[in-house]
Every structure is written in structure tokens, then in C-alpha cells.
Amino acid sequence: MNQQASFQQEEWGIGGTKNEVNRTIAISMGDDMKFKPEKINIKVGETIRFEIKNNGKLLHEMVIGTKQVLDKHAEMMVKHPNMEHDEPYMAHISPGKKGEIIWKFNRAGSFDFACLIAGHYQAGMVGKIEVQQ
């Protein structure tokens, strides 16, 4: 039986599958509250596998979204730091570990990615994704 994952369309794209991946982008993050790279260029229609490595000693995450969505989510994380959340556009990565996000960018625009763990977003742990035709 062939089961297809069911993903919800978001303003910044939709969850992707391994079979759809067009390219892989390595992202590293650490306790300096920075992502490397901090800016990513993508073409509309590309499905990207983000291979994310946490080089720090603290828990970090990568969450993709619009600035408005990330601002709202970051506010919730400050109020409820142990809140469970798991969406295809986010990955929580323990110190020294790796994780991945597979995401299809089917809409053009400027989007953000961030670590929304309490205090990390506020410290500037954010990056930019430009999706163009």
C-alpha cells in the first residue's frame, strides 16, 4: 500500500518528501546564536532538504515561516518553554546532533527561519530565505 504524507499548505510552502528533493543545503547552528549560512536563495518549486547540525551545547531548533508567524510562536515559547510542537517546517536538535527538514517552496517571497527556544530568537538567532521565480 502506498501511503502519501498529508501536508498542509502554508504561506511559505508545504512539507516535502525525500523523493521530491531537488537539493540539500547544510545548515549549522550553535551557542553563538547564529545560523550558517544566514541567507539562502531558492527557486520557486524547489524541494529542499535542510541538513541541520547543532554544534552547540544547548538545545536549538530551526523553524521556517513568515516573520509574523515566527514572532507569534516565539512569544508563545517564552510563556510556555516546554510546549510540545512538531510541524514539518521545524526541527529540534539536541547538542552535537543532526536533524533535517524537507520543505517544498512553492510560493515566491521573503521568508525567515529561526530558533524559537526562549531567549534564542530574541538574541538574533534568525536567517532569511529568498524564494524567487
PLM region spans:
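Histidine-centered active-site/metal-ligand motif
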Residues: 1, 60, 73, 120
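Extracellular/periplasmic metallocenter environments
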Residues: 2-6, 34, 87-133
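N-terminal low-complexity, Pro/Thr/Ser-rich intrinsically disordered segments
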Residues: 1-17
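Short edge beta-strand segments in beta-sheet-rich domains
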Residues: 22, 59, 122-126
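Short beta-strand and strand-turn-strand segments in soluble, beta-rich domains
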Residues: 78-86
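Short aromatic-acidic-glycine turn motif
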Residues: 68-79
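N-terminal edge beta-strand
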Residues: 12, 17-47
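Beta-strand cores of secreted/periplasmic/IMS beta-sandwich domains, seen most often
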Residues: 27, 38-64, 99-107
